[in-house]
Regions:
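N-terminal targeting signals for export/organelle localization
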Residues: 1-42, 165, 180
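Conserved hydrophobic/aromatic "anchor" residues
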Residues: 43, 59, 68-69, 113, ...
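A short beta-strand-turn-helix
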Residues: 43-64, 87
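Active-site acidic short loop of glycosyltransferases
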Residues: 60-62, 92, 119-120, 137
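Short pre-active-site segment immediately N-terminal to redox-active cysteine/selenocysteine motifs
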Residues: 62-64, 68-72, 139
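Hydrophobic beta-strand core positions in alpha/beta domains
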Residues: 65-67, 99-101, 145
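Structural microenvironment flanking redox-active thiols in thiol-disulfide oxidoreductases
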Residues: 77-117, 127-134, 169
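Thiol/disulfide oxidoreductase modules built on the thioredoxin-like
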Residues: 112-119, 126-174
């Protein structure tokens, strides 16, 4: 192969690489990663007890523990009592536990499950899993602690002991902080 031909191939390869990279960056979907420190995405879901639509905006000014779960999820079942204890201990105008079921079942099935477990905090139903998608959840249970300003402060993948000292201290601190 001649020297000129080698240079032509090398320059062509570099140009193809640069053009391909630029094209990939341009056509790549722009996805904002949901992470600690970012604004919590707005959501809409139905309250299983009242049937009324609920949005994250309705909780503005409160600290929210948003929990994504399903009735068929064993770790979710294990986690629910600690969410209930935390809600009873700290639930007020300044803090709310909001549990969103992604079950395919009817609202009545999810509501019956919540009654069976004695849950008194807000239970929403999102059978389309739009909230799971908006929050880029990988499974259930998955939870986010959102401050009064709508910013994600903590994310937990998997079950947690929500009424344990570390989690409770975080929630208390956030409730005591004024909104900005």
């Amino acid at each position: 192969m001649t020297h000129a031909r080698e240079w032509t191939i090398a320059v062509g390869s570099v140009m193809a690489l640069v053009f391909g990279t630029a094209l990939a960056v341009k056509i790549r979907p722009q996805i904002d990663l949901i992470r600690v420190g970012s604004r919590a995405p707005e959501f809409h879901a139905g309250d299983v007890r009242t049937g009324r639509p609920v949005t994250l905006e309705q909780y503005r000014g409160r600290v929210v523990l948003l929990n994504l779960w399903a009735t068929w999820c064993q770790p979710c079942r294990v986690e629910m009592p600690s969410l209930e204890r935390l809600s009873r201990r700290l639930g007020s105008d300044g803090f709310r536990v909001v549990a969103v079921s992604i079950d395919d079942d009817a609202d009545s099935v999810v509501a019956a499950y919540a009654r069976q477990l004695g849950l008194t905090f807000d239970i929403l139903h999102d059978p389309s899993a739009a909230i799971k998608q908006a929050y880029q959840a990988t499974g259930v249970p998955e939870s986010w602690v959102i401050n009064r300003d709508g910013v994600i402060i903590k994310k937990v993948i998997g079950a947690s002991e929500w009424d344990g000292p570390v989690n409770e201290a975080l929630i208390r601190r956030l409730v005591d902080e004024p909104a900005r």
